[in-house]
Amino acid sequence: MGRGLLLGAVLCLGLECLPQVASAKVLRVPEKLATIQAAVDAARNGDEIRVSPGAYCGATIDKRVELVGVGHPRIIGCAGGPVLGVARVGFYLPGPNGKNPASGTKISGFVFDGRGVSSANLEPISFGIFARFARDIEISHNHFEGTAQAITSTGGDRWRIEHNRIHDLTVLDCTGPCTGGDGIVIQLARDEVAAPGGDAAPINRPEDNLILGNTIEGGPPDGFADFSMVGILILAADHTTVLQNDLRLRDNPAAAAVSQGILLTNTCCGTGKSYLPGVRHTILAFNDGRKSEVAIVVEGSGGANTQGLFLFRNRGEQQLETAQLLLSLSRSAAIPASARPQL
C-alpha cells in the first residue's frame, strides 16, 4: 500500500496532477475569421491574431492579445468600427473605470489609413491606436498615414512605442471636433476621464514609458491658428524616455500654428488650467528635430516641467520655459494655444 501511494505521488508530481496550461492560439484573418473584431471576440488572453494583406475595419480590444500584421494590412475607417465622439478609431483600448483588460497587448505591422481626414471629412481614421489606463503595451513597426492623433496613451504605464512611421499628420480643426495634431501622446488622465484621486494620483499619471526610433512628419493646414501641432506630446507624465526619434513637424508660413517636435507641458486645450504635478523625470536624448519648426519645447515656469529633466545630444532649436513670442514675430495672428489632444 505504501509503495502504491508513493508511485501515485510520483506520477502526480511528474504528469498527472499538474494543472493544464492552455497554449496560445493563432487566429488568422481573413482565412479563419472575416474581421479583426471577430478575431478579438473569439480570442483568449495571450492569443495571437495574425492579419493577412487587405483592408479591414478597426476593432475594440478588450483582452490581452498580440495583433500581427503580415504584409502591411490596412486599417480603414468604417461606419461599424470604433469611434470617439464622431471620429473613427483604428484600434481602441477603452479601459473604463481606471482598468484596462487589454493591458499587455502588442500591435505591429499595420498601416493605419487616415489619409484625407479633416473636420469636413471624418470617414477616414482620425485616431490610429487609442488607449486609456492600459499598461505594458507594445506598439512597433506600424505606419500611420494622415490621422489627427496616431498613438495615444492616457494614464498608461510601461508602454514601448518603437520604430513607427507617421506621415502627413494633420488636425481636426475647430469647424468640427477641434482636436488632434499630435503624433504620439502620453497624457494625464484628467477631467471626466480621470479615476478617483486627482491629478497627482498614480493611477492617472502615465509612468515609465519609452518612445524610441519613430519618424513623425506633418504640418498645419493653411490658415490654421487654433493650437500647436506636436510630434511627441508629454502631458503631466513621469519617467518618460524619448530616444532617437526623427521629428519633421514643418513650419507652414500660411498658418499661425506652431509646429513642435517634442512638447513637455502641464497645460492643454485652451482652458488655461495647469495640472500639477507637471512633467517629471524625463529623458530626451539623440532626437533629431532639425526639420521641425522647433525641435523641443518645455513649457511652464519655476521648474513645473523640468524636475529631473535630462537632455543629451538632441538636434534642432530648443526652448525651455521661454515664451513663444519669437515664433510669432512675422505673423499677424496671436500666438496659438498649446496642444489640444483628444482625451
Residue ranges and their predicted role:
Residues 15-45, 53-55, 71:
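Right-handed parallel beta-helix/beta-solenoid
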